A protein has these predicted regions:
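Short, acidic Ser/Thr/Gly-rich low-complexity loop/linker segments typical of extracellular
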Residues: 46-58
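Short, small/polar residue-rich loop motifs at catalytic or cofactor-binding pockets
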Residues: 20-21, 45-47
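Structural motif
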Residues: 24-35
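Extracellular beta-sheet/turn segments enriched in Thr/Pro/Gly and aliphatic residues
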Residues: 85-109
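A short, solvent-exposed loop/turn motif at the edges and junctions
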Residues: 68, 72-91
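Beta-strand-rich domain onsets/edges
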Residues: 12-22, 100-109
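Exposed aromatic-hydrophobic patches
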Residues: 58-64
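Bacterial N-terminal signal peptides that target proteins for export
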Residues: 1-7
């Protein structure tokens, strides 16, 4: 393969992952992890990235854009949101869901 082709191939293989950051953490409610399969959405720069919790209430979403965004948790028919920042490196955000007057709210742990 020609040197120019090798450079182009290397750029294509390594450029996308270098710009992506991981957002991960846990979601709890009432002091316990939420069940597996709770939908988690992260919106940054107009793009929406989705994931879901595992049996430990943990979630992990790869977000390509950097900057201010919103995390939304879809739980028991309600969808509270909380602001976050996406970086080019892994960032942890742990959240607590709380029910107040039949309204679900979310806050950082």
């Amino acid at each position: 393969m020609k040197p120019k082709g090798v450079i182009v191939l290397a750029f294509l293989l390594f450029a996308a992952p270098a710009n992506a950051g991981e957002i991960y953490g846990t979601v709890t409610e009432g002091g316990k992890p939420v069940a597996a399969g709770v939908k988690v959405e992260i919106k940054v720069a107009g793009q929406i990235y989705a994931g879901e919790t595992d049996k430990f209430g943990s979630y992990r979403v790869i977000v390509k854009e950097k900057g201010k965004g919103m995390l939304t948790v879809h739980f028991n028919g309600q969808s509270p949101s909380f602001g976050l920042f996406s970086y080019d490196k892994s960032t942890r955000y742990d959240y607590i869901l709380e029910m107040k007057d039949s309204t679900l709210s979310i806050r950082r742990k």
